[in-house]
Regions:
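Conserved Radical SAM active-site core
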Residues: 3, 10-14, 28, 46-110, ...
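Structural recognition of alpha->loop->beta junctions
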Residues: 121-144
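P-loop/Walker A phosphate-binding loop and immediately adjacent motor/lid segment at beta-alpha junctions
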Residues: 88-96, 100, 145-181
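A generic structural signal for alpha->beta connector loops
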Residues: 11, 105, 131-132, 156
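Conserved C-terminal portion of the radical SAM core fold
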Residues: 71-80, 107, 136-142, 146, ...
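N-terminal pre-triad scaffold of radical SAM enzymes
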Residues: 13-40
Length: 181
């Protein structure tokens, strides 16, 4: 019996989908930048993504583009950046559930300005991060920016590894020789 799962994404916009990205997460990744952010961090890497209406609607064609990139045997997983992915609510949750269903062997990384500790259990935002293998949390802070931070913009940000719903600090992954440039 073939099971097909399709969850509706209605209001999520994106700016860019990149097939081969080696900067945002471990290995070769497909990356998507969603639009909309309410943090407006000084010296943000992507201020053009603050407006939720910027970019294009993440429709079935965009989703199929991401899925086709994830089918590539060289692709290790999906990276979700922004903007602020957690502002996408049910749309982001549905999208990540589909990615998890169709590509269980691929890892999912997500960057958010929210801190995991501030998210309410059972909230949509918390359900989103539970779909991810790695979450980089915290707002970008100019005075804590560092050139030697592999997957973070500033040292206050923390890389968390999801181990069965428990988030374990994993900043040491930046020092793994396999992932250095």
């Amino acid at each position: 019996m073939l099971l097909i799962i399709t969850l509706k994404v209605e209001k999520m916009n994106y700016s860019k989908i990149k097939k081969y990205d080696i900067s945002n997460g471990c290995g070769i990744r497909c990356s998507i930048w969603v639009t909309g952010c309410n943090f407006h961090c000084p010296e943000c890497f992507n201020p053009e993504l603050w407006d939720k209406n910027a970019g294009e609607l993440f429709d079935d064609l965009a989703k199929e583009k991401v899925f086709s990139y994830l089918r590539d045997e060289h692709c290790d997983g999906l990276s979700v950046l922004g903007g602020e992915p957690l502002l996408q609510g049910e749309d982001m949750l549905n999208f990540l559930k589909e990615v998890r269903f169709y590509f269980p062997e691929k890892t999912i990384w997500l960057w958010t300005g929210y801190e995991i500790s501030s998210l309410k259990k059972n909230s949509v935002e918390y359900e989103i991060i539970k779909q991810c293998d790695y979450v980089v949390d915290g707002r970008f802070k100019t005075d804590l920016a560092g050139k030697n931070l592999r997957f973070r913009g500033s040292s206050n940000q923390i890389i968390w590894r999801n181990e069965n719903g428990n988030f374990i600090e994993a900043n040491d992954i930046e020092n793994n020789e396999r992932f250095k440039k």
